[in-house]
């Protein structure tokens, strides 16, 4: 838009409406270099699993074994889990009362890993939200806490669990 406005002001100068373009000295800064957060290395995954963080451990397992985003995890409901006979159980990721999705393409069904099935059967709630104590903000802050406690996690964020899953 700066370029178009500057061209308009140049036109105004040419038409005699202005004596000089007041925006002539303005320059657009170059876009900053993007430094995306890294993919977890297997050794870092081991650190996360060994930490068995009381707040994030179950969510970390879901992130690593499904590739779900933190917002999707925080809004996960027991009702989102469906059994498909001998195919096992699946998570149906769709908008619900707790969460919106990043895009329409984010709607999907994800097969549940056996470790997660066991977690559902033994630890997580059987109705309502599976992670009622978690919000995206809490996930971000708790992961930052883990990063401080485990310096080898430097350069990673919770979303790195999704990146790790995608590379497996």
What is each residue range found by the language model?
Residues 34, 56, 87, 106, ...:
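Exposed loop/turn and edge beta-strand positions of beta-sandwich/beta-sheet ligand-binding modules
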Residues 1, 57-58, 89-91, 119-121, ...:
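Tryptophan-centric aromatic hotspots in well-structured domains and transmembrane helices
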């Amino acid at each position: 838009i700066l370029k178009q406005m500057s061209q308009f002001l140049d036109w105004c100068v040419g038409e005699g409406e202005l004596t000089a373009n007041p925006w002539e000295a303005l320059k657009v800064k170059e876009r900053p270099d993007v430094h995306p957060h890294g993919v977890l290395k297997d050794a870092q995954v081991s650190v996360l699993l060994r930490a068995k963080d009381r707040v994030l451990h179950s969510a970390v397992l879901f992130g690593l074994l499904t590739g779900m985003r933190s917002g999707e995890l925080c809004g996960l409901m027991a009702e989102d889990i469906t059994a498909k006979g001998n195919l096992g159980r699946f998570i149906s990721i769709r908008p619900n009362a707790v969460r919106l999705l990043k895009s329409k393409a984010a709607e999907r069904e994800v097969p549940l890993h056996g470790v997660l099935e066991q977690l559902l059967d033994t630890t997580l709630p059987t109705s309502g939200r599976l992670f009622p104590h978690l919000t995206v903000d809490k996930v971000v802050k708790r992961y930052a806490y883990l990063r401080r406690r485990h310096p080898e996690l430097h350069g990673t964020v919770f979303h790195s669990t999704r990146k790790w899953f995608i590379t497996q």
